[in-house]
């Protein structure tokens, strides 16, 4: 398909209709201007992605945008340094009452002017399960290129889709192989099975049986825009005061949105910020601190050397010239410079630790991605087969997979049995203790007479004796 054509051909029609698969032999022209290439990688369609800042950060790197990262926002009131935009994930249930309230509210701020729509990057989501990539591109492709290096793929996509309709921009995204392959490379194996089992539909970003959706909030020309690929138009929330930042306007919009959405005690959402790579700012700060450290250290050495020469008795000696661009020796004593040098050493150590922490985070992003995307099915099947071959699988199943009701019933029976045994033991003990005095008397009589005492006659014998006496 020719991306600039905006949906020409059967393949574009299939994508627009929501097909989740393409032919193995399909040849597509990408929006990046590359030559046609086999698209076997896209044969299974776009897959669902988790809502994870580490995943999104690695996905941006795969897109070719290296100086950006994604962070999760836990507190709206906490200031965020230089964000490019925000990505909001929420549960998508069309019939929900709060959802209808949001639709009624946002319908009033739709931007329907075609010229205004063409001047920004707004793409409709015509490819299922691509909402994560749509949300990232809605932020990145509406940023000032002077402040952000997009990379070759995204720069060409932005250039070639300029002036397209929102639907054609969505088709261009869906048929850009670099984006699709990068997107699918971060999906879990369950996503492919879920796609094969349920088919295409609204993207669900966590496998809980409920649909979730991403939208983006970005500042464009002094206005706060909300870009939702499932809406027909972009939404303009208006501008902000000169004395405030655009994030202040965003906080007010989100506070109102969450107030509506949580009217039924539903707070299942999360918020992420697209920000500059923190390591760049830390590295730049470390460079400045080390430069200042070298200047202060050099000035201190010269000052100490001059003081030593003065104390040696050479009164005619002059202090050597020192740099005047940053520090004047006459304005600082040796103690002042030593204190300043100590503070610089502390700041350098703190920032080095911050840089190490950020690098460790990136490493853990990669570790988590490997665990997330690895298919453990073969290992699990082989492991269970080995257990069955050794004849221990059945025993393990009987030990660990018993029904809970059966287990609880056996526990109750055991408790009753223990109580019965305890009661029986108590009764026998009481009887034994009651017969103890009588037994002692018998033992005493035996010891005195040398023979066992006669047994006490029973009731029947006593009755006969009474009758004989009467006679």
Swiss-Prot record:
Compositional bias ranges of the Basic residues kind: 457-471
InterPro entries attached to this UniProt entry: Papain-like_cys_pep_sf, Peptidase_C12_UCH, Peptidase_C12_UCH_sf, UCH_C
Cellular component GO terms held in the UniProt record: chromatin; cytoplasm; PR-DUB complex
Active site: 131 (nucleophile), 213 (proton donor)
Residues covered by the UCH catalytic domain: 45-276
Reaction(s) catalysed by this chain's protein: Thiol-dependent hydrolysis of ester, thioester, amide, peptide and isopeptide bonds formed by the C-terminal Gly of ubiquitin (a 76-residue protein attached to proteins as an intracellular targeting signal)
Annotated segments matching region Positively charged C-terminal tail required for binding nucleosomes: 405-471
Marked site: Transition state stabilizer: 125
Limits of the ULD domain: 375-403
Primary subcellular site in the record, as a coarse category: nucleus
Keywords assigned by UniProt, alphabetized: Chromatin regulator, Hydrolase, Nucleus, Protease, Thiol protease, Ubl conjugation pathway
Quaternary state and interactors: Catalytic component of the polycomb repressive deubiquitinase (PR-DUB) complex, at least composed of caly/calypso, Asx and sba (MBD5/6 homolog). The PR-DUB complex associates with nucleosomes to mediate deubiquitination of histone H2AK118ub1 substrates; the association requires the positively charged C-terminal tail of caly, probably due to direct binding of DNA. Interacts (via ULD domain) with Asx (via DEUBAD domain); the interaction produces a stable heterodimer with a composite binding site for ubiquitin.
Protein known as: Ubiquitin carboxyl-terminal hydrolase calypso
Organism name: Drosophila simulans
């Amino acid at each position: 398909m020719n991306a600039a054509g905006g949906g020409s051909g059967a393949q574009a029609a299939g994508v627009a209709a929501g097909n989740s698969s393409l032919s193995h032999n399909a040849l597509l022209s990408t929006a990046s201007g590359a030559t046609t290439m086999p698209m076997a990688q896209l044969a299974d369609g776009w897959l669902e992605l988790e809502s994870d800042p580490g995943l999104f950060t690695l996905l941006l790197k795969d897109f070719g945008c290296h100086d950006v990262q994604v962070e999760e926002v836990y507190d709206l009131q906490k200031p965020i340094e230089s964000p490019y935009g925000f990505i909001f994930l929420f549960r998508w249930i069309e019939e929900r009452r709060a959802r209808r309230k949001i639709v009624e509210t946002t319908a009033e701020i739709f931007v329907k002017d075609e010229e205004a729509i063409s001047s920004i990057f707004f793409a409709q989501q015509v490819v299922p399960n691509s909402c994560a990539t749509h949300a990232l591109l809605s932020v990145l492709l509406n940023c000032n290129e002077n402040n952000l290096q997009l990379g070759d793929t995204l720069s060409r996509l932005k250039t070639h889709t300029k002036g397209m309709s929102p639907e054609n921009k969505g088709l261009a995204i869906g048929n850009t192989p670099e984006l699709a392959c990068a997107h699918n490379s971060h999906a879990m194996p369950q996503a492919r099975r879920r796609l094969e089992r349920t088919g295409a539909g609204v993207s669900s970003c966590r496998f809980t049986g409920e649909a979730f959706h991403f939208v983006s909030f970005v500042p464009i020309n002094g206005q706060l825009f909300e870009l939702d690929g499932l809406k027909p138009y972009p939404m303009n929330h208006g501008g902000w005061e000169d004395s405030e930042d655009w994030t202040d306007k965003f906080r007010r919009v989100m506070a109102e949105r969450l107030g509506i959405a949580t009217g039924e005690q539903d707070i299942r959402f999360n918020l992420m910020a697209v920000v500059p790579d923190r390591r760049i700012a830390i590295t730049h700060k470390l460079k400045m601190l080390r430069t200042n450290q070298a200047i202060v250290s050099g000035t201190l050495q010269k000052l100490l050397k001059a003081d030593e020469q003065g104390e040696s008795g050479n009164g005619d000696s002059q202090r050597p010239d020192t740099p005047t661009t940053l520090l004047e020796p006459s304005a600082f004593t040796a103690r002042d410079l030593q204190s300043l040098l100590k503070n610089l050493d502390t700041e350098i150590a703190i920032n080095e630790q911050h840089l190490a922490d950020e690098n460790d985070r990136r490493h853990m992003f990669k570790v988590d991605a490997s665990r997330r995307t690895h298919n453990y099915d073969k290992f699990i099947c082989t492991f269970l087969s080995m257990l069955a071959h050794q004849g221990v699988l059945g025993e393990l199943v009987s030990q660990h997979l018993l029904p809970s009701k059966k287990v609880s019933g056996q526990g109750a029976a055991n408790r009753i049995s223990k109580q019965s045994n305890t009661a029986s033991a108590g009764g026998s003990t009481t009887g034994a203790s009651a017969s103890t005095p009588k037994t002692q008397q018998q033992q005493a009589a035996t010891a005195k007479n040398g023979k066992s005492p006669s047994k006490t006659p029973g009731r029947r014998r006593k009755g006969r004796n009474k009758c004989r006496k009467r006679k």
